[in-house]
């Protein structure tokens, strides 16, 4: 059985595993690498220095590896790296990195990215995330593991969303969202704990209670932020579910949602 449709345009220099399926009228550039059992639908465009792993499914009209929407970009050989087992739906756009950033845009494994989502230059997306339709990341955004972005969520440049966090429909994320927390609103504010997401991912009632107490410490006890942060970091030394807050606080550049 022929796995590449005869109307697809694939540069001879592109490296595709023999098991890759390519649909009609798809265009693949010379610096593209695609791993085993990845399936690409019709009318997709994959360009730039782009590496795609195994067992991905890329739907029609996706645009992956085009140049960043950054006026400073001067055709440097920056990269887009996509892991394994991702579902990338219709009309998604993933841009290359920039030399003023980390030089690459990275997407991990087992992510579910719905139609019309946009990942700008130098974004880093973890594993097992869900992006609902039209969620968009500006440049230099970091998304942790098991994050859920509601439809039409917009994330500002350099923001960070921690593991297991969730945003509501049309949230405008302008500051960092701590792990496990929910955010909602045009200028996103804290909206409680993603306790259902935690339960679905195997957290115990005791662990959820510990994280809930962190939420109360940050937002409901009237404690200055630095004092609350120090208290949470102390608890993280003995409570494994709080360990993610160490890296999150250390790497947070924009401050957290309040």
Swiss-Prot record:
Keyword Acyltransferase (UniProt): yes
One annotated GO biological process: lipid A biosynthetic process
Keywords: Acyltransferase, Cytoplasm, Lipid A biosynthesis, Lipid biosynthesis, Lipid metabolism, Repeat, Transferase
Catalytic reaction(s) noted: a (3R)-hydroxyacyl-[ACP] + UDP-N-acetyl-alpha-D-glucosamine = a UDP-3-O-[(3R)-3-hydroxyacyl]-N-acetyl-alpha-D-glucosamine + holo-[ACP]
Pfam families, alphabetized: Acetyltransf_11, Hexapep
SUPFAM superfamilies given in the database record: Trimeric LpxA-like enzymes
Gene Ontology, cellular component aspect: cytoplasm; membrane
Gene Ontology terms for molecular function: acyl-[acyl-carrier-protein]-UDP-N-acetylglucosamine O-acyltransferase activity
Pathway in which the depicted protein is active: Glycolipid biosynthesis; lipid IV(A) biosynthesis; lipid IV(A) from (3R)-3-hydroxytetradecanoyl-[acyl-carrier-protein] and UDP-N-acetyl-alpha-D-glucosamine: step 1/6
InterPro entries found in the cross-reference section: Acetyltransf_C, Acetyltransf_C_sf, Hexapep, Lipid_A_LpxA, Trimer_LpxA-like_sf
PANTHER family in alphabetical order: ACYL-[ACYL-CARRIER-PROTEIN]--UDP-N-ACETYLGLUCOSAMINE O-ACYLTRANSFERASE, ACYL-[ACYL-CARRIER-PROTEIN]--UDP-N-ACETYLGLUCOSAMINE O-ACYLTRANSFERASE, MITOCHONDRIAL-RELATED
Family to which this protein belongs: Belongs to the transferase hexapeptide repeat family. LpxA subfamily.
NCBIfam families recorded: lipid_A_lpxA, PRK05289.1
Quaternary data: Homotrimer.
Name this polypeptide is given: Acyl-[acyl-carrier-protein]--UDP-N-acetylglucosamine O-acyltransferase
Lineage per the UniProt record: Bacteria, Pseudomonadati, Pseudomonadota, Betaproteobacteria, Neisseriales
Gene that encodes it: lpxA
């Amino acid at each position: 059985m022929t796995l590449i449709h005869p109307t697809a345009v694939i540069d001879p220099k592109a490296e595709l595993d023999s098991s890759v399926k390519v649909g009609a009228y798809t265009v693949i550039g010379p610096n593209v690498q695609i791993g085993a059992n990845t399936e690409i639908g019709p009318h997709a465009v994959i360009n730039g220095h782009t590496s795609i792993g195994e067992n991905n499914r890329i739907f029609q009209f996706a645009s992956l590896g085009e140049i960043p929407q950054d006026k400073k970009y001067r055709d440097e050989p920056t990269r887009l790296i996509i892991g394994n087992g991702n579902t990338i739906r219709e009309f998604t756009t993933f841009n290359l990195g920039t030399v003023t950033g980390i030089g690459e845009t990275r997407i991990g494994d087992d992510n579910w990215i719905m139609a019309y989502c946009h990942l700008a230059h130098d974004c880093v997306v973890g594993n097992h995330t869900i992006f609902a339709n039209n969620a968009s990341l500006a440049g230099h955004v970091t998304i942790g593991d098991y994050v859920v972005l509601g439809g039409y969520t917009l994330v500002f440049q350099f923001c960070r969303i921690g593991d297991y966090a969730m945003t509501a429909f049309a949230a405008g994320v302008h500051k960092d969202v701590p792990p496990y927390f929910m955010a909602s609103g045009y200028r996103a504010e804290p909206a409680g704990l993603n306790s259902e997401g935690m339960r679905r991912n195997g957290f115990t009632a005791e662990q959820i209670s510990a994280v809930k107490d962190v939420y109360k410490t940050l937002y409901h006890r009237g404690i200055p932020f630095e004092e609350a942060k120090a208290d949470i970091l102390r608890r993280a030394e003995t409570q494994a579910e709080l360990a993610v807050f160490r890296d999150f606080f250390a790497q947070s550049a924009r401050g957290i949602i309040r």
